[in-house]
């Protein structure tokens, strides 16, 4: 800043004294009251630009920074299907791997807990108190799934909110042999229906999703066509 101001003053002197041939007056010239010299105006403009460029942006200007490291992936079930979220809200398996509706964001929301969000639609996969899988436009407690690696290196996704009351057995995300979603309380972790292979597409950074209340009546997934 000081170097820029000095340069402006030097340029002003060179304009007043070309070639250095004119003698410098010992008397200081005083600007009339209420007026500013060209040099002073340039300095004021420079200072205003520095304040604008160097000022710290407010939180509203910056917005929340992405802090959660997750992945964009396809979830391939051992039954031979890719998990797919359809625009009508239904969830099913498909043998085709070219559809963008099979792309999901796996976002960490706790210790070994993730939320599964459709990368295409922005909706979250959720499991209600009856074990039915559905698509939610908002992130709720029903959208949280515990992620664990099974002994054969397949990945299991269990509801973080619900389980069998008496036995404590987890409710798992699963597809049957026809590619239809199963009720979580009927999926066993030892069966192929619950075994998934995440096929990585890219690593991404995410903002923490805002938690909404679970609706009083959680919708179930519409039947797949």
UniProtKB/Swiss-Prot annotation:
Coiled coil: none
Gene3D superfamilies: 2.80.10.50
Record region (Disordered): 1-28
Keywords: Growth factor, Nucleus
UniProt KW Membrane keyword: no
Cellular-component GO terms for this entry: nucleus
Any GO molecular function: growth factor activity
SUPFAM superfamilies noted in UniProt: Cytokine
Main localization, broad class: nucleus
PROSITE patterns: HBGF_FGF (PS00247)
Subcellular location: Nucleus
Tissue-specificity statement: Brain and eye, and in a segmental pattern of the embryonic body wall. In adult olfactory bulb, hippocampus and most concentrated in Purkinje cell layer of the cerebellum.
Pfam families: FGF (PF00167)
Annotated CDD domains: beta-trefoil_FGF11-like
Keyword Nucleus on entry: yes
Recorded family membership: Belongs to the heparin-binding growth factors family.
Role noted for this protein: Probably involved in nervous system development and function.
Annotated protein name in UniProt: Fibroblast growth factor 11
Organism (species): Mus musculus
Record gene name: Fgf11
């Amino acid at each position: 800043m000081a170097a820029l101001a000095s340069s402006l003053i030097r340029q002003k002197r060179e304009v007043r004294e070309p070639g250095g041939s004119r003698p410098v007056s010992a008397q200081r010239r005083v600007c009339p009251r209420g007026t500013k010299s060209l040099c002073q105006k340039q300095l004021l403009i420079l200072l205003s630009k520095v304040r604008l460029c160097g000022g710290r942006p407010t939180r509203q200007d910056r917005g929340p920074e992405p802090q959660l490291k997750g992945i964009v992936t396809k979830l391939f079930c051992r039954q031979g299907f890719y998990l797919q979220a359809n625009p009508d809200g239904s969830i099913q398996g498909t043998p085709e791997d070219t559809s963008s509706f099979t792309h999901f964001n796996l976002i960490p929301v706790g210790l070994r807990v993730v939320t599964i969000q459709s990368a295409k639609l922005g909706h979250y996969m959720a499991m209600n108190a009856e074990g039915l899988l559905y698509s939610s436009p908002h992130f709720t407690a029903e959208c949280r799934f515990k992620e664990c690696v099974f002994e054969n290196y397949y990945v299991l996704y269990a509801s973080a909110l619900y389980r069998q009351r008496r036995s404590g057995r987890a409710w798992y995300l699963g597809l049957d042999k026809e590619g239809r979603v199963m009720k979580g309380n009927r999926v066993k972790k030892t069966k192929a229906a619950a075994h998934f292979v995440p096929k990585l597409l890219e690593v991404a950074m995410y903002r923490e999703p805002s938690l909404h209340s679970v609706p009083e009546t959680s919708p179930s997934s519409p039947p797949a066509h």
